[in-house]
């Protein structure tokens, strides 16, 4: 089963709770760090679920269903804020004990990863807000705009799936980062293409200027999200090799 198929919202994911570091520090710093890594992996999976909800929200026409999904995304964002703080506090507590220089460096890198994962959640929430604004102002995208955003969302999903595979992979080599770089380059290049195309399409009166603003907000936020994903992968590979 691939990560994409396995990341589906479950009832227990709707509530805030840590799974691996709830009982405080373990007997050794190494064991505590291992538990924190498991918690970070779970945190990353939550952000992938959030992005799946964003994709659902994009096409949702039923207002009641839309608001329900939007509220779930907001809830996940609040959970993400709390998870970031709890994991960071735990790692800070672990770092205050007797640690090897290697373990101290590992904690530093993990703290960086946690911050970047929370930024992914922020981006998902920003995308949801952009979609909500588009709907509130009765803006409608053309078929071409929808196709372009579909492709951008698929690229971002690919980046998230790769991130989660890396987080669950026990042994890593430096070349494991290459697929993530390739996806990130695709996202950046596609963003640049869409930015140029948007200016042309507005000039050709294919849609209104404000429609283009909402559209490019989503394109730009998707590209930012991809940056945060790559930062997580870089941190994890730096820690494991």
What are these regions (language model features)?
Residues 4-241:
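Cytosolic, long alpha-helical scaffolding segments
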